[in-house]
Amino acid sequence: MRLSRYFLPILKENPKEAEIVSHRLMLRSGMIRQQSAGIYSWLPIGLKVLNKVCTIIREEQNRAGANEILMPTIQSADLWRESGRYDAYGKEMLRIQDRQKREMLFGPTNEEMVTDIFRSYVRSYKDLPLNLYHIQWKFRDEVRPRFGVMRSREFLMKDAYSFDLDYEGAKMAYYRMFVSYLRTFARVGLQAIPMRADTGPIGGDLSHEFIILAETGESQVYCDRAYLDLAVPGADTDFRNDAQLTDTVTRWTTPYAATDEMHDEADWAKVKPESQVSARGIEVGHIFHFGTKYSEPMGAKVQGPDGKEHLVSMGSYGIGPSRLVAAAIEASHDDAGIIWPKTIAPFGAGIVNMKPGDEGCDGVSEKLYEALTNAGVDPLLDDKDERPGAKFATIDLIGLPTQVIVGPRGVAAGEVEVKDRKTGERQSLGIEAAINMLTAQA
């Protein structure tokens, strides 16, 4: 993509309404635009990042055996009355009527609808286990939306729902999603720590929030430093191997980790002082086993191997891709702007033509652009006629992992300067050497 043809509305000043780093940088770098309180448009560069996050989520959900569907945003109030949640949910739910005066709602979540889909088609235990997921926009009428897309009223969610014959099956479905989430966050460039969460009236211990440590986090969290050294399950993880999954979950839940709500001072005291980490954290995912909470009132049953009907045991697993984008910025930025992990960067590299109109600079820039494009690097070429300071500020702000600086002096010497955005390291390379280095990383 050529910057001269790209819609990138950069803001020179920090927006006054932005309270946290991610909100400020997303507005300044032209990723989003606020349309009303807690509601945002995603602009080209922001949408590219969001789509890359969703691609990783899909790949890991599919790897774990989940099936993607797409449920509508508008739901019937009747389904929610079946579960008993319509009147109990509160003012966060946007309730509407169609022209026939039928009561509808803008879905804040999808347990009722996915349970209705399941009960309409699945009759036998032989069709289990089953996991259905979708990625869809949700709306919750927050009293005080703030922090940009971190706590907005409209947001993108990946919701997965598992259906199993009994608790043991549901536990393994939970473990599969647990491991899938560890891999997802690692691929997005985040180190997420699973922390035991409240299970409410259902009880048990199958509820975890995945938290990343960040100074601007909403929650106070406590964890053993051992988490920072745990190896994330690799791409060779066998999601059909129950013993392997159980071992992984055990390793990732044995050290102490808790949010402020679940913190236990007595257990915390057992952690060696030098291993205690007390910090702020951002929730990036939540997984939860809720048994027959929805299958019982909605009649989601299957015939078991004993010939009798059994209520299915369910779980839900949520990740907010839009929130995850903001969390990645909170975890990786500096005073100059965003520092994207390579896996979700909007472009693989930025080529900065320091003197558009100069035959030498134009020729080298075009050669680099063509070579990187053909190699699948997806470069952004800054071919705009602006002063060097503005070009450097823009390329740093949008956070591309690698910058290639093409200037008259370097071109005369047959070289370009390659800068690593994260480390700030610069090296002068011959043009072919630079192409080889960057294409090897594609």
From Swiss-Prot:
One of its GO terms (cellular component) is cytosol. It is an enzyme of class 6 (ligase). It catalyses: tRNA(Pro) + L-proline + ATP = L-prolyl-tRNA(Pro) + AMP + diphosphate. It is found in: Cytoplasm. Its main location: cytoplasm. It comes from the Bacteria. The keyword Protein biosynthesis applies. One of its GO terms (biological process) is prolyl-tRNA aminoacylation. PROSITE patterns: AA_TRNA_LIGASE_II (PS50862). Keywords: Aminoacyl-tRNA synthetase, ATP-binding, Cytoplasm, Ligase, Nucleotide-binding, Protein biosynthesis. Its EC number is 6.1.1.15. HAMAP family: Pro_tRNA_synth_type2 (MF_01570). Catalyzes the attachment of proline to tRNA(Pro) in a two-step reaction: proline is first activated by ATP to form Pro-AMP and then transferred to the acceptor end of tRNA(Pro). PANTHER family: MITOCHONDRIAL RIBOSOME PROTEIN L39/PROLYL-TRNA LIGASE FAMILY MEMBER, PROLINE--TRNA LIGASE. Homodimer. This is Proline--tRNA ligase. The lineage of its organism: Bacteria, Pseudomonadati, Pseudomonadota, Alphaproteobacteria, Hyphomicrobiales. The gene is proS.
